Design a protein with these regions (language model features):
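Acidic, polar-rich low-complexity tracts and alpha-helical solenoid repeat scaffolds
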Residues: 18-277
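Sec-dependent N-terminal signal peptides
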Residues: 5-14
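N-terminal secretory signal peptides that target proteins for export/translocation
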Residues: 1-2
Length: 277
């Protein structure tokens, strides 16, 4: 497989397929392939590694409502600076060398992904103003691809963390107006972000519950499914709705959580049972 890729690259380089100004099939093939197998892949893997490290090092306080999302505090953010700068540098090089933005349409499929990674790197560095600019660009510039809604989700996340409540609400409303256009793979996150907005503004716990339950319907990965489920159990428990709280605590026990989450789910389940009558 790797030999085929190398042979293909050598062939198209030999044919002089380096222009980013001419929309030809061979130019698109060259820049799609080289952007994917050069900086973008390395940047994506580095981002995955650092986010996983952040999750592994995170310690939840089960005496409090768990946060829906795990973000770095100031000290953790600073520890990520060097790696996030590498992500930004690699993705910026991909964009500079391989972008084919012709007639208001990007012809290279990894360019929007590179912008998105730059936005995430800025988010984790807590450079919220720069992150907002990047995610807004992804959402507005790539109107013909579904990944624009990934940019929208992270744009709203950024507004929430930056306490730009009016802007967060504006783009939540915008996302809601386009809800039927959002691909299912991004609907789970959109609903979870909506729930996060309600909870961080202390606005409406029942609506947050509704959004998190919707998020679960569209969420496949175990990490987020477990987290949404535990927060739902806590929210129902807080509302003294013990039957659904116990149902979600029991669900957690079937989802292969880590020892700490399992232990606290059992304790909370017993407490909910005791007061449920």
């Amino acid at each position: 497989m790797h030999l085929r890729i190398i042979t293909f690259l050598l062939l198209i380089i030999g044919l002089g397929a380096c222009s980013t100004k001419k929309n030809t099939a061979i130019n698109r093939a060259y820049h799609n392939t080289t952007s994917r197998y050069n900086g973008y892949f390395n940047a994506r893997e580095l981002m995955k590694e650092r986010v996983q490290t952040l999750r592994d090092q995170h310690k939840d306080d089960y005496s409090q409502r768990l946060p829906i999302f795990i973000y770095p505090d100031e000290k953790q953010s600073q520890s990520m600076y060097d790696d996030m700068d590498v992500v930004i540098e690699k993705c910026s090089e991909v964009i500079e060398r391989h972008s084919m933005y012709i007639r208001r349409q990007e012809k290279v499929k990894w360019i929007d992904d590179s912008y998105f990674l730059i936005g995430k790197a800025r988010f984790y560095k807590q450079e919220y103003g720069l992150a907002e600019e990047t995610f807004l660009y992804v959402y507005q510039a790539y109107k013909k691809i579904p990944e624009r809604y990934q940019g929208l989700n992270w744009l709203i996340k950024t507004y929430i963390e930056d306490k730009e409540w009016d802007k967060a609400e504006e783009f939540l409303d915008l996302g809601e107006s386009e809800y039927n256009k959002i691909p299912e793979e991004f609907k789970g996150m959109f609903n979870a972000v909506y729930a996060d907005y309600y909870l961080k503004r202390d606005k409406d716990v029942p609506k947050a519950i509704e959004r998190l339950e919707n998020a679960l319907k569209f969420t496949d990965d175990k990490f987020h499914s477990r987290r949404y489920t535990y927060v739902l159990a806590q929210l129902y428990h807080e509302q003294r709705e013990y039957a659904p709280a116990m149902r979600y605590y029991r669900s957690i026990l079937k989802m292969n959580p880590d020892y700490t989450m399992r232990f606290n789910a059992k304790i909370s389940l017993a407490m909910a049972f005791d007061v449920s009558g």
